[in-house]
């Protein structure tokens, strides 16, 4: 069994996330892709939407894809969400599966700053959503060379959108149609997500 792992704040989840996951699933013949929302991200700002809201939006977004599944394991874990802990748990539970960590190129550039990156790559292969020629530090280039049999670059048609742009558009009362799935758009509007700056909450 081949399992893809896509972590993130998903604040909110959008078509860029979904397209990357589906493209990687198809190219690498993954049997399942797990979406794993962070509780408290280690290298990003605290999310604006609550953990419950972000989890529910990811559930809605992945509802109609039988290959996608949402795991709340980081939301249920207290404190900062570290991928090394998540990978340890998944590799134990799915001991016979091949695990593939899906990373956007921005996240991959910071990968060596993550907690225990070498422990992560011991247990998973990495699929990097590359947007063409990128500029990496020498340390990252050495890392790529060392683990060249476990790091794959996926040249996929990039969906030019960011979660911040979506939040800003919501705050300004602008349309987010075609940026997020329709049921996620309805959820954001119905629950007034991203309308208030002081909404930050990790619960």
Swiss-Prot record:
EC top class named in words: transferase
Organism lineage: Bacteria, Pseudomonadati, Dictyoglomota, Dictyoglomia, Dictyoglomales
Family annotation (PANTHER family): NICOTINATE-NUCLEOTIDE ADENYLYLTRANSFERASE-RELATED (PTHR39321), PHOSPHOPANTETHEINE ADENYLYLTRANSFERASE (PTHR39321:SF3)
Entry function: Catalyzes the reversible adenylation of nicotinate mononucleotide (NaMN) to nicotinic acid adenine dinucleotide (NaAD).
Record flagged with keyword Transferase: yes
Signal sequence coordinates: none
Catalytic activity: nicotinate beta-D-ribonucleotide + ATP + H(+) = deamido-NAD(+) + diphosphate
Entry EC number(s): 2.7.7.18
Gene Ontology MF annotations: ATP binding; nicotinamide-nucleotide adenylyltransferase activity; nicotinate-nucleotide adenylyltransferase activity
Keywords for this protein: ATP-binding, NAD, Nucleotide-binding, Nucleotidyltransferase, Pyridine nucleotide biosynthesis, Transferase
Keyword field contains Zinc: no
Name of the protein this chain belongs to: Probable nicotinate-nucleotide adenylyltransferase
Entry-linked Pfam families: CTP_transf_like (PF01467)
Homology family: Belongs to the NadD family.
Naturally occurring in which organism (per UniProt): Dictyoglomus turgidum (strain DSM 6724 / Z-1310)
Pathway named in the protein's UniProt entry: Cofactor biosynthesis; NAD(+) biosynthesis; deamido-NAD(+) from nicotinate D-ribonucleotide: step 1/1
GO biological process: NAD biosynthetic process
